[in-house]
Amino acid sequence: MHLLCFLSLACSLLAAALIPSPREAPATVAAFESGLGFSEAEPDGGEVKAFEGKDLEEQLRSVSSVDELMSVLYPDYWKMYKCQLRKGGWQQPTLNTRTGDSVKFAAAHYNTEILKSIDNEWRKTQCMPREVCIDVGKEFGAATNTFFKPPCVSVYRCGGCCNSEGLQCMNTSTGYLSKTLFEITVPLSQGPKPVTISFANHTSCRCMSKLDVYRQVHSIIRRSLPATLPQCQAANKTCPTNYVWNNYMCRCLAQQDFIFYSNVEDDSTNGFHDVCGPNKELDEDTCQCVCKGGLRPSSCGPHKELDRDSCQCVCKNKLFPNSCGANREFDENTCQCVCKRTCPRNQPLNPGKCACECTENTQKCFLKGKKFHHQTCSCYRRPCANRLKHCDPGLSFSEEVCRCVPSYWKRPHLN
């Protein structure tokens, strides 16, 4: 049942790419021709578009299954389809998120049986180990007067079609099977002799270039090559504007090569296959669109919460600037009302009260032997009315009590 749904959607997507609606036909054809390099623009621009078209053509020629084909043309949309299919069902969207128009698929031009037949044929012809019959005498170059019964044996050898004319289906690992046969030599001097012969049995295959084949045949150290095409050596990188990273080509490709239905003048990145929007990506485990970069509510910090629509951290208290009160302003970074009052030098700011307060008071000044001056918020000492010029030996004049006191009472002057 899943295979039937899979092929049905493949039919719809392929038809959508090839058969535009009448109203959008000129734009679709223009975008398609642009992707293939059929442009009448300036020579430089034409060369760029031709290069981009060659990238897409090379990519399409290299796909080896319906899944890969849809992944190239509609990466996000196809990923969402497979994800929801694993969850038990698929609901095909009916609106184009970019234009608001209903998306029209020409599914009537293909039927499920045809797609199923194509998919089965595609799988049958892929490069893989296949069971074949080989002639024992020809395999080992037996003498003309010697033959074997049975004359042929069944083993697996690599065979199938590669997606490029420059590639060959070759074995990358080989095992050996022992088979017991009758060996007969004429003129018959004795009866058939049972013999055990080892035959090469291919266990994995790969489409390889002639250079790779040469390296494998002439390799000093025989070892199995990877059975699958190598993955990108470099990690996914950030691409320029209007370019997207492609895991098959291992480089950035022009996004317009993948949007056949869009208008020529519209180079927006919100394509039809961008099902999650500009700030989100598909989580294949949950089949949900989540914020890019792993942004979660816990990463927003105190006083903030994650807006799941815009994927931005916003203030959770929803305060407005006029709700902070006098001498306070709303700080969007901390999501709090902060004091912005400017105080005189002798009246520092008290952040908790957002008020200018004196650092000195009557009690503090009294302990210093001074009086508190309210206007200046400072302590001061009144001059002595009768200041003695000379004190008896062992005594010193104190400005605090305006009399002579023992010298050891006098506090040292502190710089």
Curated annotation (Swiss-Prot):
Residues 1-31 form the signal peptide. Disulfide bonds join 127-169, 158-205, 162-207. One of its GO terms (molecular function) is vascular endothelial growth factor receptor 3 binding. GO terms for biological process: angiogenesis; animal organ morphogenesis; cell population proliferation; cellular response to leukemia inhibitory factor; epithelial cell proliferation; glial cell proliferation; induction of positive chemotaxis; morphogenesis of embryonic epithelium. Expressed in adult heart, brain, spleen, lung, liver, skeletal muscle, kidney, testis and intestine with higher levels in heart, brain and kidney. Isoform 4 levels are very low. Isoform 3 is mostly expressed in liver and has reduced expression level in other tissues. Isoform 2 is mostly expressed in brain and kidney, although a lower level expression in other tissues is also detectable. It is found in: Secreted. Gene3D superfamilies: Cystine-knot cytokines. Undergoes a complex proteolytic maturation which generates a variety of processed secreted forms with increased activity toward VEGFR-3, but only the fully processed form could activate VEGFR-2. VEGF-C first form an antiparallel homodimer linked by disulfide bonds. Before secretion, a cleavage occurs between Arg-223 and Ser-224 producing a heterotetramer. The next extracellular step of the processing removes the N-terminal propeptide. Finally the mature VEGF-C is composed mostly of two VEGF homology domains (VHDs) bound by non-covalent interactions. Residues 276-358 are annotated as: 4 X 16 AA repeats of C-X(10)-C-X-C-X(1,3)-C. InterPro entries: CXCXC_repeat (IPR004153), Cystine-knot_cytokine (IPR029034), PD_growth_factor_CS (IPR023581), PDGF/VEGF_dom (IPR000072), PDGF/VEGF_growth_factor (IPR050507). Residues 32-107, 224-415 form a propeptide. Its main location: secreted. One of its GO terms (cellular component) is membrane. Growth factor active in angiogenesis, and endothelial cell growth, stimulating their proliferation and migration and also has effects on the permeability of blood vessels. May function in angiogenesis of the venous and lymphatic vascular systems during embryogenesis, and also in the maintenance of differentiated lymphatic endothelium in adults. Binds and activates KDR/VEGFR2 and FLT4/VEGFR3 receptors. Belongs to the PDGF/VEGF growth factor family. This is Vascular endothelial growth factor C.
